[in-house]
Amino acid sequence: MTVIRQQDFIESIEDALQYISYYHPLDFIQALEQAYHKEQNQAAKDAIAQILINSRMSAEGHRPICQDTGIVTCFVKIGMDVKWDKTDLTVQQMVDEGTRRAYLNPDNPLRASIVADPAGARKNTKDNTPSVVHIDLVAGHHVEVMIAAKGGGSENKTKMAMLNPSDSIVDWVLETLPKMGAGWCPPGMLGIGIGGTAEKAAVLAKEALMEPVDIQELIAKGAETADEKLRLELYEKVNKLGIGAQGLGGLTTVVDVKINSVPTHAASLPVVMIPNCAATRHLHFHLDGSGPADIKPPKLEDWPQVTWELGSKVRRVNLDTITPADVQSWQAGETVLLSGKMLTGRDAAHKRIADMLNKGEGLPEGVDLKNRFIYYVGPVDAVRDEVVGPAGPTTATRMDKFTEMMLSQTGLLGMIGKSERGDLTVESIKKHKAVYLMAVGGAAYLVSKAIKKSRVVAFADLGMEAIYEFEVEDMPVTVAVDSNGNNVHKQGPAIWKANIAELDAKLKAK
C-alpha cells in the first residue's frame, strides 16, 4: 500500500501549472522549428518566428507564454493500492487548491479567467477555480497526473458530431476545420475522440491532446492500425488545406493529429475534434509516495535560435495623430508598427458599452473612441518592474456582434485582435472605411514588451476585462482587413491551398 501525502499532491499541481505557464513542451517547440524552416509563406513564417521567440522569452523570464492562462483540465489516474494520508479533501478539492496557489503565485501570477454562474452573472472566481478533473481508478500503487491549461480561443472551436456509421470521418474533418477560422491559433494539434457516447468522445479527444508530438516517427514507421492510418491521412490532408499559421495561409496548419477511440454502439459514430493552439501547455507526472513530483526544467539551449526581421517595407504609425484619411492607403497583408495610445476592450466591456449606448447614456467617463484604435485583450497582472503582464490578442470574431455599433456610434477607427472577422463585419469595416489589424496569438510576452505605459480608464470591476489605455512603441501588427474590405484570412488560405495543390502535382509528375 502506497501512502500519498495530500500536501505532495497539491504542491505538485501548483508546480506543474506554474511550469506549463512559461515552458512549452519541447516536442512541440521542435515541431514548430521544423514548420518554421519548411514554411514558404513569409507572413506565416514571421508568425511562427514570433511564437518561437516569445516561447524562449517566457522560458527565460518565467512569465506566461499567453495571456490566456487557460482553464485547468486534469486527468488523475489513481492506483487501487494507493492510500491518502488525509481524507478531508476530495481529489477535486486538492486539484483546486493547487490551482488556486499556482494562479495566485506572487512571483508569476496567472490570469484568472473562470467565471461562475455562466448562464447568469458570469462573475470571475478570482483564482481560476474550479478546475475540470477526470478521475480514473486503475491497477497499481501510484498516482498518474496529466494536466493542461487550455485557452478559450482553441477550446471554443471544439466540434462534435454524431455521424452515421457509414460516414467518412476524414470528410467531416476536412469540411469542418476551415469553418473553425483561425481563432484556435494554428499551427497546433488536433485531438480527435471516436466512439463510446458523445461525452466519452469529448473526453477522449481532450486526453489525446496530452500525448507527445510523434507524427514524424509514425510517418517513418508506417501505420499499423486503423487509427494510425487515419492520423496520417488527416495530417496530410489538413495541411493541404493551406490554412497556415494564424490562418494567414501556409504549409503547416497542424504539427500532429492525435486520435483516441473506443468501441461504440452499432448505430452510432460519435466524433469530437478539439484543437490545441500554438500555446500548447501540458505536463505528465507520477507520485509514488516519496514526495512531490520532481519536475525538471528544460535547458534553454534546447530552444531554436530564431530571429525575426521586419524588413524594409514596414509602415510606422503614430496612433496619437492618425486620421481616417491615413488608413485608406493601408493594404491587407502589410506589416505596421504602432506607437502611441490605444484603448483595450473585450467581451464584457463591449457588452457594457452596448447597454450604455442603448440606454442613451453615452460612453463611460474617460473613454473617447473617436479616431482611436481598440485592442481586444485581457492582460496578465504585472509583476516587479513590468508595465503590464503578457498581453496578447484575444479572438476578434467574438466582438463581431458589436462592431457595427462601435464603428457607427463611437467613431472608432480601427481594431486589433487575432483571427478572422465574419463577412458582415468585413462589410461594416469597408462601409465605415475602418481597418482591422492582427497581432500574433501565442506571442503575449513578446507583445507586452512593446507596451510602455498602462492604466485602467473604465470598468475596473471587470478585472482583466476592464478598459485600459496602453501606450505602445513599435507594436507589430498585420493589416488583416483594410478599408476596402480586402481580407488576408480569405486570401491567404485560398492562395496557399492552390499553391500546395500545384506543388503536389509537380511532385507526382516527377
Residues of each region from the PLM?
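Short, well-ordered loop/turn sites that connect or cap secondary structure elements
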Residues: 327-330, 336
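Residue "hotspots" at secondary-structure boundaries inside conserved domains
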Residues: 325-328, 367
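Short, charged beta-turn/beta-strand-edge "cap" motif at the junction between a beta-strand
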Residues: 335, 341-345
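Feature captures the catalytic cores and cofactor-binding loops of soluble hydro-lyases/lyases
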Residues: 209, 213-249, 344-475
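C-terminal binding/interaction regions
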Residues: 249-257, 264-265, 278, 300, ...
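Short, structured beta-strand/loop micro-motifs enriched in basic residues and often containing a Trp
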Residues: 312-322
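Non-transmembrane, aqueous-exposed alpha-helical and coiled segments at domain scale
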Residues: 1-310, 408
